[in-house]
Amino acid sequence: MISASRAAAARLVGAAASRGPTAARHQDSWNGLSHEAFRLVSRRDYASEAIKGAVVGIDLGTTNSCVAVMEGKQAKVLENAEGARTTPSVVAFTADGERLVGMPAKRQAVTNPNNTFYATKRLIGRRYDDPEVQKDIKNVPFKIVRASNGDAWVEAHGKLYSPSQIGAFVLMKMKETAENYLGHTAKNAVITVPAYFNDSQRQATKDAGQISGLNVLRVINEPTAAALAYGLDKSEDKVIAVYDLGGGTFDISILEIQKGVFEVKSTNGDTFLGGEDFDQALLRHIVKEFKRETGVDLTKDNMALQRVREAAEKAKCELSSSVQTDINLPYLTMDSSGPKHLNMKLTRAQFEGIVTDLIRRTIAPCQKAMQDAEVSKSDIGEVILVGGMTRMPKVQQTVQDLFGRAPSKAVNPDEAVAIGAAIQGGVLAGDVTDVLLLDVTPLSLGIETLGGVFTKLINRNTTIPTKKSQVFSTAADGQTQVEIKVCQGEREMAGDNKLLGQFTLIGIPPAPRGVPQIEVTFDIDANGIVHVSAKDKGTGREQQIVIQSSGGLSKDDIENMVKNAEKYAEEDRRKKERVEAVNMAEGIIHDTETKMEEFKDQLPADECNKLKEEISKMRELLARKDSETGENIRQAASSLQQASLKLFEMAYKKMASEREGSGSSGTGEQKEDQKEEKQ
């Protein structure tokens, strides 16, 4: 915090107020580019040099994630190992330390709710004390804890994990999916984030990419990515709105598409509004009804709650296509009178009534986005729906009422974001040359000045990359250092906005208040990540940082997490190798026993007994498979296979010789018969 005392760092005060017209001329010095020149700079900035190999596009979603790659001029969504085009963003840790990701993790959530993490994207880049985090703590079965840096982390089996780590485990699954398809290592990626993510959340997402072993070339906004997916093959110029209501976040972006240039005019949203909230609202309704009917409170039973949570999600999805659904959960819980079953009918109208306030919360951001973009609903040529929640008929009707037109269904709401990320990857790799993306910063950026006022340097919806400087001065006589507090938000007082970070400029020569000239420069890169510098114009002394909040992951944290992720990857590889070897061994045992039964009359008894001993040894090895390597199991299985092949070869030879013997004796008898007939 900037102190007003002489000894400590003082609050900055705008130089224009203390130095008259001269200082005023220093204010608001943009990087001085015309619009056309800016576009040329942006084109250059958006084309990365010497990118080798494919660039994968990843939609790291709250509920589900998706990965796509460019094939020529078309983006292709890839199927994971389970054959699905989207992967649940769920990570679980079993009692024996095994890590599960995706559908395997989701499937065991009912029996392991305390160690199964879902929707952790809502925690990424957030402090433990944030009101949203405190609200989440009451709604999830797993433990959210305060990390040593004040951030919100999660805990499983006594181990702490940052939300970036959990995101990295999901990204590793996406990376593996891409590598299985490509047939080689996937290193470069474009990852999407909600448009309304602040700097801390964007930085934490980049950290997740780094932990997973990816080189994150660009972090782009989800609605912008969806617009790329929609508009890549469109030739006409138009203004579009992208309404993105996903699993955990809501974004609205207004874009202008003109001859391959995708220019974001404004963006708005709510980073704590999505399908998870709809599930939670329905869950509360079900629990309340169950308590009214049975007198049993389910909120103390995590396993029962997890079953209700899954049933609520399923019912929500079914009501998008049906007007009524049944929720049946037998043996949900029990009391002294015996087991209790849940059986409930739910209509679409009832569900809409339960979540109507959540849907209404999307209206104000849409109106604000249109106002900021200076467009009316009649100017918008198309409304694109993105995110699974936009399948809900009531949401679609709300969008239609809001924009005065039926929304387009031209893109797949689950896949459009990953497709757009892959297209941006193609742009960065130089494979897609006729597309330019001009995005914006979603929130205003500035510093705390005298009296705790938030002084904005860069307003929201400014096109990025961008750079802006402003000159400030000291607030006290003889002040030798100033503390720069960097904030992001729209409130008038700095304390009401998100504190991104702070740093101190020292060594200012003592002078009366208002005399020193301190130039503060904000530079936002194409990822939307903030770089700040402060320079004493009198001495030339400069201090600069890439903003990292007082929380966030340090370089050492990230390096340790990268090592842990590599360790997990190695463990996963060994586990897979062992499972494959066990499957091979069990197959060989089955085949051997089947053949022994089939050829028992042709096989020597002593050789059979030897082979049975080999099978017994193999079974003993498989009984302790968790402590054996895949290579040991494979070698033992191969040895058994070789022994069985030799034995069955003997059986085949014996059978063949018996057939030949019976065939020749049959021929001799035939000749004797012919002789008798002639006589």
Swiss-Prot record:
Transit peptide, UniProt annotation: 1-46
Keyword Aminoacyl-tRNA synthetase: no
Residue ranges with Basic and acidic residues bias: 669-679
Sites bearing Omega-N-methylarginine, chain numbering: 513
Outcome after substituting residue 441 to A: No effect on interaction with UBXN2A
Primary location recorded for the protein, binned into one broad class: mitochondrion
Modified residues (N6-succinyllysine): 135, 138, 206, 300, 368, 394, 567, 600, 610, 646
Region (Interaction with NFS1): 1-432
GO biological process, one term: intracellular protein transport
Region (Interaction with FXN and ISCU): 432-679
Activity-regulation annotation: The chaperone activity is regulated by ATP-induced allosteric coupling of the nucleotide-binding (NBD) and substrate-binding (SBD) domains. ATP binding in the NBD leads to a conformational change in the NBD, which is transferred through the interdomain linker (IDL) to the substrate-binding domain (SBD). This elicits a reduced substrate affinity and a faster substrate exchange rate. Upon hydrolysis of ATP to ADP, the protein undergoes a conformational change that increases its affinity for substrate proteins.
Region (Disordered): 656-679
Protein location: Mitochondrion; Nucleus, Nucleolus; Cytoplasm; Mitochondrion matrix
Recorded catalytic activity of this chain's protein: ATP + H2O = ADP + phosphate + H(+)
Source taxon at top rank: Eukaryota
Keywords: Acetylation, ATP-binding, Chaperone, Cytoplasm, Disease variant, Dwarfism, Hydrolase, Methylation, Mitochondrion, Nucleotide-binding, Nucleus, Phosphoprotein, Transit peptide
Record PTM N6-acetyllysine, positions in chain: 76, 135, 138, 143, 206, 234, 288, 300, 567, 600, 612, 646
Result for mutant: residue 415 to K: In SIDBA4; uncertain significance
Binding site residues for ADP: 63-64, 313, 316, 320, 388, 391
HAMAP family referenced in this protein's UniProt entry, alphabetically: DnaK
UniProt subunit comment: Interacts strongly with the intermediate form of FXN and weakly with its mature form. Interacts with HSCB. Associates with the mitochondrial contact site and cristae organizing system (MICOS) complex, composed of at least MICOS10/MIC10, CHCHD3/MIC19, CHCHD6/MIC25, APOOL/MIC27, IMMT/MIC60, APOO/MIC23/MIC26 and QIL1/MIC13. This complex was also known under the names MINOS or MitOS complex. The MICOS complex associates with mitochondrial outer membrane proteins SAMM50, MTX1, MTX2 and DNAJC11, mitochondrial inner membrane protein TMEM11 and with HSPA9.
Protein family: Belongs to the heat shock protein 70 family.
Name of this chain's protein: Stress-70 protein, mitochondrial
